[in-house]
């Protein structure tokens, strides 16, 4: 994906990591430096255009990634640059991966509710002309190392069939734990939670009231709370 400004100078590294501040990375020594506000506007343009491209590829009604969404959430965006593409010396973008921690209520394999806060895959896009060249795995692997997580510890928001196949091919993630929300988790998710998942007390059947102990009566709270 190409832009009218110098992507190669704006993003010096092959993979750039952006947070909610969308600050331009440090420039290489010897390069001219436009006003910082102009650089941030260029960053925002890249984020917006990548979000639109991802939404189009996934047939979504609207982008789920944009500069404004990034600024209002504590998400992290990994952007992969094509170091070999230099149209007019400006470089190009291969794709991106967006992640973030979210508090979720998920079911384990015994259908017990668990309150967890895993790292979630929120959006993932590689330009159509550059797929099946190892770029997706390179980007995903960089994120795993940077965030210090294992693939089975992730929760994925509304994954496409293409993403599920990608995870199966590269990370042997196949068996999912059925959920009632839009997130997908895989077998092994609960075995490696850190911090540990907090289990919620099972819902009591109507009329099944547990007797109070003396200490419970003194505290005014039913046993188990």
Curated annotation (Swiss-Prot):
<keyword id="KW-0966">Cell projection</keyword>
<feature type="modified residue" description="N6-acetyllysine; by autocatalysis">
    <location>
        <position position="56"/>
    </location>
</feature>
<feature type="site" description="Crucial for catalytic activity">
    <location>
        <position position="58"/>
    </location>
</feature>
<dbReference type="GO" id="GO:0019799">
    <property type="term" value="F:tubulin N-acetyltransferase activity"/>
</dbReference>
<keyword id="KW-0012">Acyltransferase</keyword>
<feature type="binding site">
    <location>
        <begin position="160"/>
        <end position="169"/>
    </location>
    <ligand>
        <name>acetyl-CoA</name>
    </ligand>
</feature>
<dbReference type="GO" id="GO:0048666">
    <property type="term" value="P:neuron development"/>
</dbReference>
<keyword id="KW-0965">Cell junction</keyword>
<keyword id="KW-0206">Cytoskeleton</keyword>
<keyword id="KW-0472">Membrane</keyword>
<keyword id="KW-0168">Coated pit</keyword>
<dbReference type="GO" id="GO:0030424">
    <property type="term" value="C:axon"/>
</dbReference>
<dbReference type="InterPro" id="IPR007965">
    <property type="entry name" value="GNAT_ATAT"/>
</dbReference>
<dbReference type="InterPro" id="IPR016181">
    <property type="entry name" value="Acyl_CoA_acyltransferase"/>
</dbReference>
<dbReference type="Pfam" id="PF05301">
    <property type="entry name" value="Acetyltransf_16"/>
</dbReference>
<comment type="similarity">
    <text>Belongs to the acetyltransferase ATAT1 family.</text>
</comment>
<dbReference type="GO" id="GO:0070507">
    <property type="term" value="P:regulation of microtubule cytoskeleton organization"/>
</dbReference>
<dbReference type="GO" id="GO:0005819">
    <property type="term" value="C:spindle"/>
</dbReference>
<dbReference type="GO" id="GO:0005925">
    <property type="term" value="C:focal adhesion"/>
</dbReference>
<dbReference type="GO" id="GO:0005874">
    <property type="term" value="C:microtubule"/>
</dbReference>
<dbReference type="GO" id="GO:0071929">
    <property type="term" value="P:alpha-tubulin acetylation"/>
</dbReference>
<dbReference type="GO" id="GO:0004468">
    <property type="term" value="F:L-lysine N-acetyltransferase activity, acting on acetyl phosphate as donor"/>
</dbReference>
<feature type="region of interest" description="Disordered">
    <location>
        <begin position="195"/>
        <end position="225"/>
    </location>
</feature>
<feature type="compositionally biased region" description="Basic and acidic residues">
    <location>
        <begin position="203"/>
        <end position="219"/>
    </location>
</feature>
<feature type="modified residue" description="N6-acetyllysine; by autocatalysis">
    <location>
        <position position="210"/>
    </location>
</feature>
<protein>
    <recommendedName>
        <fullName>Alpha-tubulin N-acetyltransferase 1</fullName>
        <ecNumber>2.3.1.108</ecNumber>
    </recommendedName>
</protein>
<comment type="subunit">
    <text>Component of the BBSome complex. Interacts with AP2 alpha-adaptins, including AP2A2, but not with AP1 gamma-adaptin (AP1G1/AP1G2); this interaction is required for efficient alpha-tubulin acetylation, hence clathrin-coated pits are sites of microtubule acetylation.</text>
</comment>
<comment type="function">
    <text>Specifically acetylates 'Lys-40' in alpha-tubulin on the lumenal side of microtubules. Promotes microtubule destabilization and accelerates microtubule dynamics; this activity may be independent of acetylation activity. Acetylates alpha-tubulin with a slow enzymatic rate, due to a catalytic site that is not optimized for acetyl transfer. Enters the microtubule through each end and diffuses quickly throughout the lumen of microtubules.</text>
</comment>
<dbReference type="GO" id="GO:0005905">
    <property type="term" value="C:clathrin-coated pit"/>
</dbReference>
<feature type="modified residue" description="N6-acetyllysine; by autocatalysis">
    <location>
        <position position="146"/>
    </location>
</feature>
<keyword id="KW-0963">Cytoplasm</keyword>
<keyword id="KW-0808">Transferase</keyword>
<feature type="binding site">
    <location>
        <begin position="124"/>
        <end position="137"/>
    </location>
    <ligand>
        <name>acetyl-CoA</name>
    </ligand>
</feature>
<feature type="domain" description="N-acetyltransferase">
    <location>
        <begin position="1"/>
        <end position="190"/>
    </location>
</feature>
<dbReference type="InterPro" id="IPR038746">
    <property type="entry name" value="Atat"/>
</dbReference>
<dbReference type="GO" id="GO:0000226">
    <property type="term" value="P:microtubule cytoskeleton organization"/>
</dbReference>
<keyword id="KW-0007">Acetylation</keyword>
<dbReference type="GO" id="GO:0005737">
    <property type="term" value="C:cytoplasm"/>
</dbReference>
């Amino acid at each position: 994906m190409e832009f009218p400004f110098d992507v190669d100078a704006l993003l010096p590294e092959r993979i750039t990591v952006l947070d909610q501040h969308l600050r331009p990375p440090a420039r290489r020594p010897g390069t001219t430096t436009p006003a910082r506000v102009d650089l941030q506007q260029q960053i925002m343009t890249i984020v917006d255009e990548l979000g639109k491209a991802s939404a189009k590829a996934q047939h979504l009604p609207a982008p789920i990634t944009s500069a404004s969404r990034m600024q209002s959430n504590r998400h992290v965006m990994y952007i992969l640059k094509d170091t070999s593409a230099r149209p007019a010396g400006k470089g190009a973008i291969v794709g991106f991966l967006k992640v973030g921690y979210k508090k979720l209520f998920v079911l384990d394999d015994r259908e017990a509710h668990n309150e967890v806060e895993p790292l979630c895959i929120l959006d993932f896009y590689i330009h159509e002309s550059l797929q099946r060249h190892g770029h997706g795995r390179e980007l995903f692997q960089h994120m795993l190392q940077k965030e210090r997580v294992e693939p089975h510890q992730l929760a994925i928001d509304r994954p496409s069939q293409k993403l599920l196949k990608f995870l199966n091919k590269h990370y042997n993630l196949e068996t999912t734990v059925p959920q009632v929300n839009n997130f997908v988790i895989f077998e092994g998710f609960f075995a490696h939670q850190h911090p540990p998942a907090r289990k919620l007390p099972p819902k009591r059947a109507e009329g099944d009231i547990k007797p109070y102990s003396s200490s419970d009566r003194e505290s005014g709270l039913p046993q188990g709370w």
